[in-house]
Curated annotation (Swiss-Prot):
This is Thermosome subunit beta. The gene is thsB. One of its GO terms (molecular function) is ATP hydrolysis activity. Keywords: ATP-binding, Chaperone, Nucleotide-binding. Signal peptide: none annotated. InterPro entries: Chaperone_TCP-1 (IPR017998), Chaperonin_TCP-1_CS (IPR002194), Cpn60/GroEL/TCP-1 (IPR002423), GroEL-like_apical_dom_sf (IPR027409), GROEL-like_equatorial_sf (IPR027413), TCP-1-like_intermed_sf (IPR027410), TCP-1_chaperonin (IPR053374), thermosome_alpha (IPR054827). Forms a Heterooligomeric complex of two stacked eight-membered rings. It comes from the Archaea. CDD domains: cpn60. Pfam families: Cpn60_TCP1. Residues 528-538 have a biased composition (Gly residues). The keyword Ligase does not apply.
Length: 538
């Protein structure tokens, strides 16, 4: 700079900027730290994490996406890996930990290639080629199956190591029945399976209700507690006298006018109730409020009514009973009513709940999850959600792959052969991608207390003979996973590898990180805090 020339500030004061290798090193390190955090939770022998938030609420889980959501992560590169886990959860419901640790390992291998002076663009290109080839290999080794036995095995594999060991089989039965029940034209709408959790009793006391459970109670004690052969009305409007939108005053000059006014209000409420009762409805679910007087008249008519039901529950009730949700009482007709064998109010763990059961061919069902404590019930709920996702994926795709690290080893083996056919430096990236996939069986072995090097060597040798050889973490042997019944949906692996590759590729392409200083804090303050959210300092 020439003497006396004024420095030019392009960025605001206090902004941190990292270029080139510094930016890549920092982002890769953040990704590796995040992957290491969830790595110990992988597999049937994976450990749990205890997460305590600022209010002292505790979550005990080994579900990858739950851990990452509960952690207060601020580093931008680490946040990208959290998005990988969320995408995996939304798409297939399982394989979140697998996706994150593969992404972390891809970044680790990329770091070695960067030190060999290989350009990030070449590494990214090689990773993309490897990911595309991996998808082809996965399609080739997939097993066509969607029979009940396969679905049971898929569900049990997904729940292994998630606090459901003793009740794996009965829970798998419930999940397969639930998915099969809501399936329509080969597609499964997972939102139509409601999971209602209540502490108390044992995990294997969990049940499947062919209908919907509503966590509400009757609006009036005079209403029947149980209605058989229920005719159900669903209303999305209040049963009360409408308030005027403008302020209005009524001048009363005579007490009889006041009485007439009150009687008119009562008559309006009575007419509303009569129009419901006249359709033949003996059960009413209302999304809005029900006036006290309307409750009285409904109780006199022997109608079981529930108010302020959630919109999502109303939609499930419609799917389960065949009722139409009506937004105007005057439009309610007998054709809009749904049917259920029994609607009753039951006490579960000291709380009243409404059970809508024995629906004919319901397209919405409920799994009532039980467990000894709130933490147990929450972890079982997460395991069931994962299992529903994988069973639904298997029903829709009709394809599965072996578990126990078998597909990763097979893909790695074939990718190494494929790498030899590639000219140029991309070959090194494809080989690195193949090695990165071996992190899955390696982690499964380490978490089971086995020697990961011995296991990997044995697995590679076994795959010269069979595609389906994987590690049985319970006895430490290499077995045929297909024969052992350890299988996973094809979609879970496909999505995990695809998401991990895309995230790693995106992070590698970043060569400049510009971080604006947060208001009221200095760069030194960030350094003292250990960078962003406990990640490498920026």
């Amino acid at each position: 700079m020439a003497q006396g020339q004024q420095p030019i500030l392009v960025l605001p004061e206090g902004t941190s900027r990292y270029l080139g290798r510094d930016a890549q090193r920092m982002n890769i390190l953040a990704g590796k730290i995040l992957a290491e955090t969830v790595r110990t939770t992988l597999g049937p022998k994976g450990m749990d994490k205890m997460l305590v938030d600022s209010l002292g609420d505790i979550v005990v889980t080994n579900d990858g996406v739950t851990i990452l959501k509960e952690m207060d992560i601020e580093h931008p590169a680490a946040k990208m890996l959290v998005e990988v886990a969320k995408t995996q959860e939304d798409e297939v419901g399982d394989g979140t930990t697998t996706a994150v640790i593969i992404a972390g390992e891809l970044l680790k291998k990329a770091e070695n290639l960067l030190e060999m002076e290989i350009h990030p663009t070449i590494i990214a290109m090689g990773y993309r080629q490897a990911a595309e080839k991996a998808q082809e290999i996965l399609d080739d080794i997939a097993i066509d199956a969607s029979d009940r036995d396969t679905l049971m095995k898929v569900a049990m594999t997904a729940m292994t190591g998630k606090g459901t060991e003793k009740a794996r089989e009965p829970l798998a039965e419930l999940i397969v029945d639930a998915v099969k029940q809501v399936e329509e034209d080969g597609e499964v709408e997972k939102d139509h399976i409601k999971i209602e959790k209540k502490e108390g009793a044992a995990v294997d006391d969990s049940t499947l209700v062919q209908g919907v459970i509503i966590d509400k109670e009757r609006v009036h004690p005079g209403m029947p507690k149980k209605v058989e052969n229920a005719k159900i009305a669903l209303l999305n409007c209040p049963i009360e006298v409408k308030e005027t939108e403008v302020d209005a005053e009524i001048r009363i000059t005579d007490p009889s006018q006041m009485q007439a006014f009150i009687e008119q209000e009562e008559q309006m409420i009575r007419d509303m109730v009569n129009s419901i009762v006249d359709t033949g409805a003996n059960v009413l679910f209302c999304q809005k409020g029900i006036d006290d007087l309307a409750q009285h008249y409904l109780a006199k008519a022997g109608v079981l009514a529930v108010r302020r039901v959630k919109k999502s529950d109303m939609e499930k009730l419609s799917k389960a009973t065949g009722a139409n949700i009506v937004t105007n009482i005057e439009d309610l007709s007998p054709e809009d009513l749904g049917e259920a064998g029994v609607v009753s109010e039951k006490k579960i763990s000291g709380e009243e709940m409404i059970f809508v059961e024995e629906c004919k061919e319901p397209k919405a069902v409920t799994i009532l999850v039980r467990g000894s404590t709130e933490h147990v019930v929450s972890e079982v709920e997460r395991a069931i959600e994962d299992a529903i996702g994988v069973v639904a994926a298997t029903v829709e795709d009709g394809k599965v792959v072996a578990g126990g690290g078998a597909p990763e080893i097979e893909i790695a083996k074939r990718l190494k052969d494929y790498a030899d056919s590639i000219s140029g430096r991309e070959q090194l990236a494809v080989s690195a991608f193949a090695e990165a996939l071996e992190i899955v069986p390696k982690t499964l072995a380490e978490n089971a207390g086995l020697d990961s090097i011995d296991v990997l060597v044995d697995l590679r040798a076994a795959h010269e003979e069979s595609t389906y050889m994987g590690i049985d973490v319970f006895d430490g042997k290499i077995v045929d996973m297909k024969e052992a019944g350890v299988i996973e949906p094809h979609r879970v692996k496909k999505q995990a590898i695809q998401s991990a590759a895309e995230a790693a590729e995106m992070i590698l392409r970043i060569d400049d990180v510009i971080a604006a200083s947060s208001s009221g804090s200095s760069e030194e303050g960030m350094e003292e805090m250990g960078g962003m959210g406990g990640m490498p300092p920026m």
